[in-house]
Regions:
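Key DNA-contact positions within bacterial/archaeal DNA-binding proteins
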Residues: 42, 98
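Extreme N-terminal segment that seeds HTH/winged-HTH DNA-binding domains in transcriptional regulators
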Residues: 1-38
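Basic, amphipathic "hinge/linker" alpha-helix immediately C-terminal to the N-terminal HTH DNA-binding motif
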Residues: 63-82
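Mid-protein regulatory/catalytic core that forms ligand/cofactor-binding pockets
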Residues: 109-222
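Basic amphipathic alpha-helical segments that dock to polyanions
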Residues: 13, 33, 44-54, 190
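Helix-turn-helix DNA-binding elements, focusing on the entry/boundary residues of the two helices
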Residues: 30, 48, 86
Length: 239
């Protein structure tokens, strides 16, 4: 059975299950799949039974959902298609990064493995998509990014640390409007940010993009979407 022999629904479910494990160590459940897809629990439960009967997942009743080796192979292949198509739309056709997710969702089910291989070659074998997500290689290997959400990174700042300098490695593409906001404020993949605490009793952080003078306040939704790596920290004495 090839990837294109799977139904569109099956392809989507496998991709969602894998995606839920990419940046989280939490077990995947029917509930988390329902939340991610917006589908009813009854629909998800029926789909999990079908995937299990096909040997694509292991799912104990009311337990976690795990991909089998075959299921993971198909899931990663779908992720590879999606992220290569996003890269093509941005790099070649001039789409903005907030426009490509839904477009790629529609296209990824219609293309062949041969097309994907030629697209990868045409693009020069990119390792990451426009949002910074790793593009799986043809053999299924996935680059591991040394990055954490800005929310977690800021929470782990040592007491007495005044500033945190980070590089944006990856930005979640789940909210196009948030992507537009990031673009407008210069918060893009590769940007260097200086992070300081927000106002007292506020959950917002303030970040300054390198070479910019004005700080940008970011709430939890925004900081959850930003995945960063540490450049340095500065204490009040050394600031």
């Amino acid at each position: 059975m090839s990837l294109n022999d799977l139904s569109t629904s099956t392809q989507n479910y496998l991709k969602v299950i894998w995606s839920l494990t990419e940046w989280s160590s939490e077990p995947v459940t029917a509930t988390s799949i329902s939340r991610q897809t917006g589908l009813r629990m009854s629909s998800v439960s029926d789909a999990m039974r079908k995937l299990s009967s096909q040997g694509l997942i292991v799912h104990a009743p009311y337990g976690s959902v795990e991909l089998t080796d075959e299921g993971r192979t198909y899931a990663v292949a779908m992720i590879r298609r999606h992220r290569l198509i996003e890269s093509f739309l941005v790099d070649t056709l001039g789409y903005t990064w907030d426009q490509v997710h839904d477009e790629a969702e529609n296209m990824e089910h219609a293309v062949s493995d041969f097309f994907v291989a030629r697209l990868d070659e045409f693009l020069g074998h990119p390792e990451r998509d426009p949002h910074g997500d790793p593009i799986p290689a043809a053999d299924g290997t996935v680059l591991a990014l040394d990055a954490r959400s800005l929310t977690d990174m800021a929470a782990a700042m040592e007491t007495g640390t005044e500033k945190l300098r980070v590089t944006v490695e990856r930005i979640s593409d789940s909210d196009p409007e948030l992507l537009k906001h990031f673009e407008e404020t210069g918060i893009v993949v590769g940007a260097v940010l200086t992070v300081t605490e927000g106002a007292p009793f506020s959950e917002a952080l303030e970040v300054t993009v390198d070479k910019a003078s004005q700080a940008v306040p970011l709430g939890n939704i925004a900081t959850d979407a930003l995945f960063v790596s540490t450049l340095s920290t500065a204490s009040p004495a050394s600031a």
